[in-house]
UniProtKB/Swiss-Prot annotation:
Recorded GO MF terms: 4 iron, 4 sulfur cluster binding; 5'-3' exonuclease activity; ATP binding; double-stranded DNA binding; helicase activity; metal ion binding
Annotated family: Belongs to the helicase family. AddB/RexB type 1 subfamily.
List of residues binding ATP: 8-15
Keywords carried by this UniProt record: 4Fe-4S, ATP-binding, DNA damage, DNA repair, DNA-binding, Exonuclease, Helicase, Hydrolase, Iron, Iron-sulfur, Metal-binding, Nuclease, Nucleotide-binding
UniProt superkingdom: Bacteria
Known cofactor(s): Mg(2+); [4Fe-4S] cluster
Subunit details: Heterodimer of AddA and AddB.
Domain UvrD-like helicase C-terminal: 281-587
Domain UvrD-like helicase ATP-binding: residue ranges: 1-301
HAMAP family: AddB_type1
Matches recorded under NCBIfam families: addB_Gpos
Record's protein name: ATP-dependent helicase/deoxyribonuclease subunit B
Record note on cofactor: Binds 1 [4Fe-4S] cluster.
């Protein structure tokens, strides 16, 4: 029994020496005693390849490559002890979740922390760390007692409470495992206990290679191997000079030196002979003088400079994507021109989560075979999401998001259905559920769902149509597709008495959905499309889910568990599932993490993402214990994993290992911006390399090839997939600035695409965008007629929409596009309720031959409550009755109607105008409807402007009859004559024109009426601020002022006094007008003469004629208006359709100039030729 060290700097040939010894021994004595070759888990595959890669050794039974965990399996299979069930990381997380849930009330610190993402991953890691460092639950308990006794500060008490929680959970976890289960760390402990019984290990020649340090648990295994083996050879990366000096924590080889001393100490304790150390001084790995210099002088202070051409390249990239593309281009160049194999190349990085998706896409586009040495989570696979969301449906009372997350996995679809058709139907079904607010008991009720096309309160009494009945049948059929399997599982889960029965319910749910067959179909489809990675995913995920259910049953099968806890535990397990990595092929680029990789036989290394805070890593507290807390525990005798300070000291060694992997070329790069465009800084490590290599090659990698030389541009011509985007860049440059001779080879590339049978069609779609202009072509006369008909019938709002943006009008009224309905109370719904409520009260007063002035305060309150109760069941699919929140909102709306009723009562008392009709239709047909505003357009098309007028008031005096329009608004509004001029506010003047023009037919026969004005009434329940102790009368007066109606009234003092009979001089509290002492109007009065009203009405006609002409001539310009801070696009539903973009030459706002009312009136007069 002896111990031998083989030491040397990186690249000195330590592993090569050991492998050659083993190979020579196998060649001389192929049937001798066992040879164990122990390496880190990440090195097992490549070491096995290297061991049998010699021409003289094609295979071996005598020599075996193991990691510690694989050796444990081997020994336990031989001597016994492996019969207990293995639980993987997912099983550990599930068990911990169950333990935490059952212990929750007794936890001090982790009670709330347990709900945070990643908690169980950290807790599992903490327990694994305890085991690796031989810390038992009793050790943790003793530590808690010690801390609890001596804690004085808040920080000490927090640590004591944290340690208390940890010992409780660790102890429960260990008790749950005893005699039944083994987790990954338990195998090493069992190996320590059983190793001495192994005949396989006794007398073996043992090599331990590729380690830099050992945990206490691993060190005990090394101790056991020393006792049993003939000779143990351990390789360590140490400079021989370091061993001759005192151990210094700042030394590059500090970690490996400590490991060397610890192992020698174990050998002394076990009285094992320590052979003479073999120091390796040469650098056989490096075929490049520059890389040999980098290795030899990496830690030198000051930096030793290397002059001459260096095989080191430093690149900065415009962004992360440009960096990866630069790497891909260089890899292709090495393979194409320098006789490299893909397996000779490695890409090292640290922040893989930022890079992996981009690398998979780009390396595939560049046809670079690659292997990413990183496990992917299964959490996004349809099967995992289906189980998780189905359980969430049941535990969360059938919430919309959970239901449709489950639907979108497509595993609920019948097996033989056409997926494309089913997706379309499910989209319609989802729209229905959103519009009707379907959730909770409505899913489980047997009552059929109803479908009605809802537009307004008036639709509530209409009969169901055939198309509605057909849609209703489809909706109920799809409802059963979604709910039936979930309800079956729900019933089984509720009947289940044990965890085993609950797991069985999940399994039957999957089986009844034919999930195995559906996954097989997905696998076949992935293989047919050449996506072999995802093809294996579908196989793995089913096996892993079944294994998870088996583990759940094995661990907790006979226990009783609530549905919510079962869901939490199952979800925790599902989130821990990972896809196993498929071993790399013999010729792939290896992409690996700097911290975990163990590489050999690499000629060229690309180190990417070398940004500040990433390489070297910024210190960061992670896990259950902070650095300070770990130091306290270490001082008390509990050894744990290194603190972030120790890790930071070790970072130099990690970086040394990183830059010494390659034998010929080293590439270092960093992006200057991330995927979101945020600025990133280059690492100080790059400055260090520049100091060592003053002549280093530096380059800037960009996505834009325009500024590059011809030779540099040629490197961007790679595969057809990626080159197409660069062809587009060049053509855009040519289009914008003209042809340049040094770019002529791009025309050859362009010709390849347009003549290639394979790429002609694919490229035409991309290249055609070069001439894309975001302009809407004018519709032909025929198309316009087909869309709008021979007679255009539209509301004033439609006409105003056309003037806001012609394309928005086309989208809404030509294409009939609309946003999908959502079950929520929007401003239009509230406005509709207000209108309906006030109309019902007014109708009741008309029937009783009363006015608003006749109402008492109590009657106003009673009537407001009554009409709200009548309307609530009819509004937006009974939304006001759907929840406590909406019931509260109903009460608030009733208060607003009550307040509005009081104000209308006060207005009526002060006014000579009385309502003569409400919700007056024109052009709508039926009894009581006034005729539409009709236009015969020059192209022969008829146009009718139709609508409904909120309220028409009438007053009479000796000079005649006057009519005014009142429009109820749920927000404050005034009449802006600038907006009238631009056709954005035509509604009120149209209404006034309709009622005055048709006065002879709907009032007394043959009577005429003059315009008195148009006014907006703001429906709200205002809050007023009063100074001092104000009386109730003063408060009511102030509230009345808040309801002052804005608009435009006739500039006749008598008519104004009819509107406010309390007005003598000063400003009116009711309308936006005021009188001076001499009887003239104040400057702030919104007034117009009768002649001006006539001009305005003519202008309205003029505007409609122009709008009608443009609509029928097919004008659909993408030309939204902008006026001050108002723009047509602000609340437009069609922005995603028109794709208006100000950066495009053709897309600019129509900027409208704001004007004073007098200026606007003058321009209006000019347009119609008025005087």
């Amino acid at each position: 029994m002896s111990l031998r060290f083989v030491i040397g700097r990186a690249g000195s040939g330590k592993s090569t020496l050991c492998l050659h010894e083993v190979q020579e021994e196998l060649k001389q004595r192929p049937r001798g005693k066992t040879i164990l070759y122990l390496v880190p888990e990440q090195m097992t595959f490549q070491t096995q390849q290297a061991l049998i890669g010699s021409e003289d050794v094609r295979g071996s039974i005598r020599a075996q490559v193991f990691s510690f965990s694989r050796l444990a399996w081997k020994v336990l299979q031989e001597v016994g002890g492996a019969s207990r069930l293995h639980i993987d990381e997912a099983g550990v997380h599930m068990l911990l979740r169950k333990i935490v849930e059952s212990r929750k009330d007794g936890l001090s610190v982790f009670q709330k922390a347990a709900e945070q993402n990643g908690f169980f991953e950290h807790l599992g890691s903490m327990i694994a760390e305890f085991k690796r460092y031989n810390v038992t639950p009793s050790n943790v308990y003793e530590m808690w007692q010690q801390l609890d006794t001596h804690s004085s500060s808040a920080e000490q008490k927090l640590l004591a409470n944290k340690v208390y929680d940890l010992q409780l959970l660790y102890d429960d976890f260990e008790r749950a495992l005893i005699g039944k289960y083994l987790d990954s760390e338990d195998y090493l402990q069992l190996l320590i206990e059983k190793l001495s019984d192994s005949e396989y290990v006794k007398g073996a020649e043992i090599y331990i290679d590729g380690f830099h340090s050992f945990s206490p648990q691993e060190l005990e295994i090394v101790r056991g191997l020393m006792r049993l083996g003939t000779r143990v050879t351990i390789t360590l990366t140490i400079d021989e000079k370091t061993l001759a000096q005192p151990v210094n924590e700042l030394d590059l080889f500090y970690e490996t030196t400590l490991t060397y001393e610890r192992i020698k100490q174990v050998a002394r304790e076990e009285k094992i002979e320590v052979e003479k150390t073999i120091p390796l001084m040469k650098q056989p790995r490096f075929h490049s003088q520059a890389l040999a210099h980098l290795e030899m002088h990496y830690e030198a202070r000051p930096n030793e400079k290397f002059h001459g051409e260096a095989s080191v390249t430093i690149s900065t990239a415009a962004n992360l994507r440009a960096e990866v593309e630069g790497v891909a281009r260089e890899i292709r160049r090495l393979v194409a021109t320098e006789d490299y194999r893909y397996r000779d190349i490695a890409v090292l990085l640290r922040n893989g989560e930022s890079y992996y998706d981009v690398m998979r896409t780009l390396f595939t586009d560049y046809n670079i075979p690659h292997f990413i040495d990183e496990k992917r989570p299964m959490s996004h696979h349809p099967l995992v999401e289906c189980i998780r969301s189905a359980l969430e449906i049941i535990s969360g009372n059938w919430r919309y998001d959970a239901v449709f997350r489950c639907v979108k996995t497509e595993l609920l679809y019948p097996l033989d259905v056409r997926k494309e058709a089913m997706r379309e139907e499910m989209d319609e079904f989802e729209n229905y559920c959103l519009a009707y607010g379907v959730q909770g008991k409505r899913w489980t009720s047997e009552d059929p769902w109803m479908y009605r096309r809802y537009r307004s309160l008036d639709d509530a009494s209409e009969m169901i149509t055939d198309s509605e009945r057909e849609m209703e049948e489809k909706i109920n059929r799809l409802r059963d597709v979604v709910r039936t399997p979930v309800i079956r599982m729900q019933k089984r889960l509720k009947r289940a008495g044990t965890v085993m029965q609950m797991c069985e319910a999940v399994y039957l749910f999957l089986e009844e959905l034919d999930v195995p067959k559906k996954l097989e179909a997905l696998r076949i489809r992935a293989e047919e499309s050449g996506d072999f990675l995802f093809a294996t995913d579908h196989e793995q995920v089913w096996e892993e889910v079944m294994s998870l259910l088996d583990t759940f049953v094995e661990m907790l099968g006979e226990e009783k568990m609530s549905l919510s806890m079962f869901t939490d535990v199952m979800t925790t397990g599902l989130e821990a599932l990972q896809f196993a990595n498929i071993p790399p092929s013999l010729d792939q680029v290896l992409v690996a993490n700097i911290d975990h990789s163990r590489l050999s036989d690499i000629k060229a290394t690309f180190i990417i993402g070398v940004n500040e805070g990433v390489i070297p890593a910024a210190p960061m507290d992670e896990g259950m214990l902070s650095d300070e807390e770990r130091n306290v525990l270490t001082a008390a005798g509990i050894e744990l994993a290194p603190t972030t300070r120790q890790t930071l000291l070790e970072e130099q060694f990690v970086m040394y290992q990183m830059v010494t992997r390659a034998s010929e070329k080293l590439y270092i790069s960093c992006p200057l911006a991330d995927e979101e465009g945020k600025t990133l800084l280059a690492s100080s490590f790059i400055k260090k390399i520049k100091r060592m290599f003053p002549d280093v090659k530096e380059s800037f990698i960009t996505n834009d090839v325009n500024d590059l030389s011809r030779s540099e541009q040629l490197s961007y011509v790679a595969t057809p997939e990626v080159t197409l985007s660069y062809v587009m860049q060049q053509l855009q440059t040519w289009k914008r600035y003209g042809f340049e001779g040094n770019l002529d080879f791009w025309w050859d590339v362009y010709n390849f695409y347009v003549t290639s049978d394979e790429w002609k069609q694919k490229s035409s779609r991309v290249l055609s965008s070069l001439f894309y202009r975001n302009r809407a072509q004018k519709l032909s006369t025929d198309v316009s007629r087909d869309l709008y008909g021979d007679t255009i019938k539209g509301s004033v709002s439609r006409m105003e929409l056309f003037n806001r943006c012609a394309y928005a009008h086309f989208a809404q009224h030509g294409l009939s596009l609309r946003e999908r309905d959502i079950f929520k109370l929007d401003a239009p719904d509230i406005g509709e309720l207000f209108h309906a409520a006030l109309k019902r009260i007014a109708d009741k007063l008309l029937r009783e031959n009363r006015t608003w002035a006749d109402l008492s305060i109590k009657e106003c309150e009673h009537l407001s409550a009554l009409v709200i109760e009548e309307i609530a069941p009819l509004l937006q699919r009974q939304i006001l009755l759907s929840s406590n929140r909406h019931f509260y909102l109903k009460q608030k709306l009733q208060q607003i109607i009550f307040r509005t009723s009081l104000i209308l009562r006060e207005h009526a008392k002060s006014s000579g105008f009385v309502p003569v009709d409400l919700e007056v239709p024109f052009g709508m047909g039926g009894t009581g409807s006034l005729p539409p505003m009709e236009f015969a357009l020059p192209n022969g098309v008829k146009m009718e402007v139709v609508g409904r007028i909120d309220r028409v008031d009438k007053a009479e005096d000796e000079s005649g009859t006057f009519l005014r329009i009142i429009d109820y608004k749920s927000s404050s509004k005034a009449l802006d004559l600038t907006e009238v001029y631009y056709g954005l506010a035509l509604q009120m003047l149209t209404y006034l024109d309709v009622v005055t023009s048709n006065a002879h037919t709907w009032m007394k026969k043959g009577s005429t009426a003059s315009p008195a004005g148009v006014l907006y009434f703001h429906i709200h329940n205002p809050i007023v601020e009063m100074k001092g102790d104000a009386s109730e009368e003063e408060i009511e007066k102030e509230i009345l002022k808040k309801f002052k109606m804005k608009g435009l009234v006739l500039g006749d003092a008598d008519v104004v006094r009819l509107m406010d009979n309390k007005l003598s001089t000063g400003s009116s509290d009711i309308i936006s007008a005021g009188l001076k002492k001499d009887g003239s109007f104040s400057a702030r009065s919104s007034i117009a003469s009768e002649q001006e009203f006539n001009v305005l009405q003519k202008y309205v006609h003029h505007s409609f004629e122009n709008i009608g002409k443009d609509i029928t001539e097919g004008v659909i310009d993408i030309a939204p208006y902008k006026k001050g801070n108002k723009a047509a696009c602000t609340f437009c539903n069609f922005k995603s359709v028109c794709q208006f973009d100000e950066s495009l030459e053709d897309n600019q706002f129509r900027t409208l100039k704001d004007m004073k009312d007098s200026e606007a009136m003058e321009k209006i007069r000019e347009e119609v030729g008025g005087e």
